[in-house]
């Protein structure tokens, strides 16, 4: 009876026929087999039972089945294997006809139902494969070897891999490597329909090639690319280049061998079409780039990760008349970049023309020019909690951008002082709007901690900053040849500067370390510097700094400045400077030494800055107090032989008579108030 498929063994679930209440054989007992949930003793309920021979043949037997003295079921006195073709009930009786067991459905106890389990939808889960996983994990997986790939690291496997991808795209399957090394001579193109590409170990063979990209005619590619290793081998140009990719993850990849000019590890977006890349995540990748042969001068481009959206290309988005133009379609949208490690090259990450980009929790190191470059025309960016190490020129640069947040980053360098360009941990310029710099730690040999120009609506707060030139420097312009008085400015070439003024800058709650000037403000090139508030700053090492606050104006166009609650223990009055004294300020309050020291007057036209207490210290006649604030009141202490000249339009003294210090002039105090452009005497103590 070879046509029978009998795989259900007639047996106790414990595989031994024993008594119910003692571990003894059911000697000379009987077994009855019937339909599920019926009494098998009743002949109407019984089903056919077979003896399975050693050759796999089956012989039908009658019931009941006899149990021998040892507890084994026998046929014609011989121990045999009894089977059925279906699930069944089973009753076991002893030699005295007493029921010992009854099982309404033996299959519930899994005596032998592998074929049944294999026939279920989850059956593929039961079959394992090498090196790991099961058949069900790989039902929709294609390998390059299925299409002829050799994977020896020398033969060209491009066509086999491309054929595998084409097939997978057509059938909505995945392509997965087998652990071998695939050498390729041409760009592998992903196509719409492929679900993922993973575990490929690829080496580039052709000069300046792109290893992995997508079909030029496809947009809305949705494909996860993960756990791949790409070696550009010193000849390849780009590891991965995707555009028009959506809702995809690029993760756990490793890209090495990047040494050429204009090379990229992972790049999303190109400038030559309007394909939209959106809702993508780039995470937990490793990109190792070779050293920049030009040592961070910015003349080369070697990028680990790039997000390149469309932007107005003329002069970095600036027209020749200085206006910033936002006229390009948004092509790189909502990208999450996190957990990546990028080492070397010129820019660890570069992302112009992007919107809704989050760059967080990455480790970027040894970018010879910048760790993070968000210029040009990116908007709504978050740069947070990154570790930025040893950028040669600047750790973070953002230019011609709006609504960028730079928060909680650790920024350290021990090599930026050797580079002549930028030299700023965080640098911004080129018509910036809505920038927040908050809670960053900046240490090392930076010349500037935070350095910006051409900006509006900027907040710089709660940062810890260490630098050698200026911790926070805000300028209205950058010049290739700054005026001599702009002592903390650096030479910068800006061939097409924005026309915007620099205004609405809030600086608050920062901790100043290092030896550089803590706060530097510079108005240059006839551009206005306005509405800058500095408050609640803590300046360490104030006594050893060249300046705590330095304000320079080349065109008297700084206005609306304010200083308040500046704690600079150990500072002296000469640690503060303003070209026009109080003139550009709305208010100065509670600034260590600046608002508390008695300031000596030795010239005919002393510049008033900060303090309200001045002491005549020479016999030079005083003809004006320069640069007072409207409504400001000052006290002037006399000096033997010292003189204040009455001039009704400049200094108006009591009775229209000059003040001349007599023998007790050291005790004289005259109080003045500025109304309009005239100082009025309001009282004296003598």
Regions found by a protein language model. Give the residues of each.
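N-terminal assembly/attachment segments of tailed bacteriophage virion structural proteins
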Residues: 1-113, 147-148, 155-173, 177-182
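Extracellular disulfide-bonded cysteine-rich modules/repeats
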Residues: 87-90, 666-675
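Fibrous stalk/shaft segments of extracellular and virion attachment machinery
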Residues: 107-159
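Exposed extracellular interaction/assembly regions and N-terminal maturation sites
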Residues: 126, 131-146, 589-652, 674-686
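N-terminal extracellular ligand-recognition/capping segment immediately after the signal peptide
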Residues: 158, 162, 166-209, 581, ...
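Short glycine/acidic-rich loop motifs that flank beta-strands on beta-rich extracellular proteins
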Residues: 173, 184-187, 204-210, 230-241, ...
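Beta-solenoid repeat scaffold
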Residues: 174, 185-205, 214-227, 247, ...
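Consensus "Asn ladder" position of solenoid repeat domains
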Residues: 228, 253, 280, 285, ...
């Amino acid at each position: 009876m070879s046509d029978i498929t009998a795989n259900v063994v007639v047996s106790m679930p414990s595989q031994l026929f024993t008594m119910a209440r003692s571990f003894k054989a059911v000697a000379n007992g009987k077994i009855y087999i019937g339909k599920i949930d019926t009494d098998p003793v009743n002949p109407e309920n019984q089903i056919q039972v077979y003896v399975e021979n050693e050759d796999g043949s089956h012989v039908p037997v009658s019931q009941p089945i006899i149990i021998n003295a040892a507890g084994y079921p026998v046929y014609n006195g011989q121990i045999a294997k009894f089977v059925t073709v279906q699930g069944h009930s089973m009753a076991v009786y002893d030699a005295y006809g007493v029921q010992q067991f009854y099982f309404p459905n033996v299959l519930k106890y899994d005596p032998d139902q592998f074929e049944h389990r294999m026939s279920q939808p989850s059956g593929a889960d039961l079959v394992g494969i090498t090196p790991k996983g099961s058949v069900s994990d790989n039902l929709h997986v294609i390998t390059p070897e299925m299409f002829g790939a050799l994977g020896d690291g020398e033969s060209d496997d491009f066509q086999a891999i491309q054929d595998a991808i084409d097939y997978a795209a057509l059938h909505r399957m995945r392509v997965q490597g087998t652990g071998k090394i695939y050498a390729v001579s041409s760009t592998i193109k992903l196509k719409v329909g492929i679900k993922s590409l993973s575990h490929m170990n690829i080496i580039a063979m052709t000069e300046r090639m792109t290893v992995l990209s997508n079909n030029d005619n496809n947009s809305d590619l949705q494909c996860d690319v993960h756990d791949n290793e790409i070696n550009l081998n010193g000849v390849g140009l780009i590891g991965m280049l995707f555009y028009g990719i959506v809702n995809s993850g690029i993760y756990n990849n490793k890209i090495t061998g990047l040494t050429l000019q204009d090379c990229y590890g992972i790049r999303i977006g190109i400038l030559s079409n309007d394909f939209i890349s959106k809702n993508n995540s780039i995470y937990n990748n490793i990109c190792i780039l070779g050293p920049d042969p030009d040592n961070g001068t910015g003349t080369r481009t070697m990028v680990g990760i790039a997000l390149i959206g469309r932007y107005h290309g003329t002069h970095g988005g600036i027209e020749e008349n200085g206006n910033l133009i936002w006229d390009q379609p948004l092509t790189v949208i909502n990208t999450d970049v996190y957990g990546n490690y990028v080492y070397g090259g010129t820019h660890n990450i570069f992302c112009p023309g992007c919107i809704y980009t989050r760059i967080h929790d990455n480790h970027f190191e040894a970018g010879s020019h910048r760790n993070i470059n968000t210029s040009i025309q990116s908007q709504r960016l978050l740069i947070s909690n990154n570790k930025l190490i040893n950028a040669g020129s600047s750790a973070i640069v953002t230019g011609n951008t709006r609504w960028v947040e730079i928060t909680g980053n650790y920024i350290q360098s021990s090599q930026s002082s050797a580079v002549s360009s930028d030299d700023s941990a965080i640098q911004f310029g080129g018509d910036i709007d809505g920038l927040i710099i908050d809670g960053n730690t900046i240490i090392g040999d930076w010349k500037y901690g935070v350095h910006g120009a051409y900006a509006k609506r900027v907040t710089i707060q709660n940062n810890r900053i260490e630098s050698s030139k200026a911790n926070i420097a805000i300028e209205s312009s950058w010049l290739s040849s700054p005026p001599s008085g702009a002592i903390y400015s650096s030479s910068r070439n800006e061939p097409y500067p924005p026309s915007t003024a620099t205004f609405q800058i809030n600086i608050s709650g920062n901790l100043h370390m290092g030896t550089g000037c803590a706060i530097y403000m510079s108005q240059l090139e006839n551009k206005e510097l306005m509405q800058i508030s500095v408050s609640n700053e803590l300046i360490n090492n104030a006594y050893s700094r060249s300046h705590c606050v330095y304000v320079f104006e080349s065109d008297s166009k700084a206005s609306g400045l304010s200083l308040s609650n500046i704690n600079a223990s150990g500072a002296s009055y000469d640690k503060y400077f303003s070209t026009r004294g109080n003139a550009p300020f709305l208010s100065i309050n509670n600034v260590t030494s600046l608002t508390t020291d008695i300031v000596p007057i030795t010239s005919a036209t002393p510049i008033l800055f900060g303090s309200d207490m001045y002491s005549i210290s020479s016999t030079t006649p005083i003809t004006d107090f320069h640069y007072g604030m409207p409504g400001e009141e000052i006290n002037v202490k006399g000096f033997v032989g010292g003189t204040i000249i009455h001039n009704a339009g400049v200094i108006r003294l009591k009775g229209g008579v000059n003040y001349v210090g007599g023998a007790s002039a050291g005790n004289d105090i005259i109080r003045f108030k500025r109304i309009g452009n005239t100082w009025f005497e309001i009282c004296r103590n003598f």
